[in-house]
Amino acid sequence: MIRNPIPWPNGARCAACVTFDMDADSLIHIAYPDDGHSRVSAISMLQYGPRVAIPRIVETYRQLAIRQTFFIPAWCIEHYPEAIETILRGGHEIAHHGYLH
């Protein structure tokens, strides 16, 4: 039992933290440094996050009036600036997640 419980606002009993890692296709380039660019199927699947999922997540969180933290490698920031702008326009935080994961 906690002797000095944390006083959460509005009578809440706890808090939750939701974060997203946006690694995109940086994972392919780590696993296959010499020919990662040629693995079209895997790259296509991993590009779904920054191209489709990020706008949907940001819009859902806008509707719920929730802000969150996205952990993103610098490589992804360089390659997906539109996703980064979408996140920032939504008022969300971007946290460092290495350069290439």
What are these regions (language model features)?
Residues M1-H101:
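Catalytic alpha-helical scaffold of carbohydrate-active enzymes acting on polysaccharides/glycoconjugates
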